[in-house]
Amino acid sequence: MKYEQLAKDIIQHVGGKENVISVVHCITRLRFKLKDEGKANTDVLKNMDGIVTVMKSGGQYQVVIGNHVPDVYKDVVEIGGFQNQAETETEDEKKYQGLFNKFIDIIASIFTPVLGVLAATGMIKGLNALFLSTGVLEEANGTYQLLHAIGDSLFYFFPIFLGYTAAKKFGATPFIGMAIGASLVYPTLVVLTEGEPLYTLFTGTIFESPVHITFLGIPVILMSYATSVIPIILAAYFASKVEARLRKIIPDVVKTFLVPFFTLLIVVPLTFIVIGPIATWAGQLLGQFTLWVYNLSPIIAGAFLGGFWQVFVIFGLHWGLIPIAINNLVVQGSDPVLAMVFAASFAQIGAVAAVWLKIKQQKVKTLSVPAFISGIFGVTEPAIYGVTLPLKRPFIISCIAAAVGGAIIGLFRSQGYIIGGLGIFGIPSFLHPADGMDAGFWGIVIAVVVAFVLGFILTYLFGLKSGNASDEQTETKAHTSTGTGEKEEISSPFNGSVITLSEIKDEAFSSGALGEGIAIEPSEGKLFSPVSGMVTALYPTHHALGITTDRGAELLIHIGLDTVQLDGKFFTAHTIQGAQVEKGDLLIEFDIKEIKAAGYAVTTPVIVTNHKQYGQLFLTDKQQVNAGDRLLELTR
């Protein structure tokens, strides 16, 4: 841990971890909620190396660190064991989220922990299918059987794995979730479905179901829950409510075993009798609906999903499609959804390859190599956030190329038959179980090649502005300083009134401890980039951001005072961390009226955090400025 000693000292002098209710951080400071602020040694903390100052505001004990606060926070949380408290704080902050965002968060939290292993077992299953279709192995071969068991294991017992992650997400005991999932795939109950039913319910309807056993005289509809998704998630949610209720009424002395005892006795039978059948029917209807939409126009569906897939990834919306894809595999035996988006990652790396070949900026060129390599294996985040999205045009072009690839996949009606690996390791996922390399498989191959080539050619021809492909010597000159009076101008990011830092009612800024600069009282809720450079920090609540200019100046712009408490309300970001921006680009919009109505000032410090690298810093003498006017001038 990089800041281990500092973290230990901070915990000690805020009164020890037992005095900490919770700790979160904003862009510059740790924000503690303490049981007793009187136990904190404020004077000691203020004089500590690595701490700028200490402040008390809004019921929080704030330890100002600086731009590296996320790293210090990580060590404080780990050493103090505050993870659960931090998670609780995050849940409180989610009160402003909409239902859709909550749904995406739930899906992501449940599936993310198992995706790595799911992809790995899928790769094994895909390679095994490839060996079978090419005649390398036969079904009766022991090697094939063992590889099949490894590859199919997680998917078959999916309810057990999801029982753990879903229970953890919903606040239940994870092992109770696993036990519920294990009950759903218990071999004896699975075998019973192969025998003669006692009778049949809902005869003649789409819900017709044979009954093989009863529970206390109540008919139990045994369904195939192997590989299923929806039943265990709903069961885990129900279990979390039951367990929470039981914990309130069962005495502590017997709580350890009686809570899971009664939870399982209540939840498992109800899952088999009610939750499981309803969830399974819902899954079947969802699968039929997805297939109906797809059949309306596979080409248009492929172009739409393929073209917007990387956009979905950026906003986390792709998590909403993954359960649908898995459900399709369970219900239909194949899935078109993940097939239609498969070419998107290859469109990305095609664009990245063109950027690497043409761009002269060494920083971006260096990023392109690892981004390309990771993209080959389906991990596109480095390509998106490090290369194509900051440059804008390559990202748009990659989406267009992915749309073409998706349309081709729709044309061939390609399907996925397993949840396989990513990138090149995902190709065997599209081998037909019976026909092997059928037309659908070759449709995937053609789409991948077309998406890559199209992304490469269009990016090479149209993807880079002339400034981004300029001579490398220009960039080198911009980053070097001989100490002979080289100047750099920082423009105003707002329209508004200029005030000095010393007038700000926040010691961390007014003292100059975080850096030298100036402050603005914005008259319009729009923040424009004051320089050309990179967004090196963007706090999740969008109230503050850091920008490093092309010439190396590090700026911190903090909209308002203590506005982190608004949890992102009234702020809208038009950029992301890692984005390359030009002077005058709109970065953030904010509602001045609503922020003030909530009781917060919008006075905004604009500071140079690495001001010590400069010999002089000149401030504007204007009292009113417009966005784009000269605000600061730095001289080395």
UniProtKB/Swiss-Prot annotation:
Membrane spanning residue stretches: 104-124, 146-166, 172-192, 215-235, 258-278, 299-319, 337-357, 369-389, 407-427, 444-464
Organism for this UniProt entry: Halalkalibacterium halodurans (strain ATCC BAA-125 / DSM 18197 / FERM 7344 / JCM 9153 / C-125)
Name of the protein this chain belongs to: PTS system beta-glucoside-specific EIIBCA component
GO cellular component: plasma membrane
Entry domain remark: The EIIB domain is phosphorylated by phospho-EIIA on a cysteinyl or histidyl residue, depending on the transported sugar. Then, it transfers the phosphoryl group to the sugar substrate concomitantly with the sugar uptake processed by the EIIC domain.
EC number: 2.7.1.-
Phylogenetic lineage: Bacteria, Bacillati, Bacillota, Bacilli, Bacillales
Keywords recorded for this protein, A-Z: Cell membrane, Kinase, Membrane, Phosphotransferase system, Sugar transport, Transferase, Transmembrane, Transmembrane helix, Transport
Root EC class: transferase
GO biological process entries: phosphoenolpyruvate-dependent sugar phosphotransferase system; trehalose transport
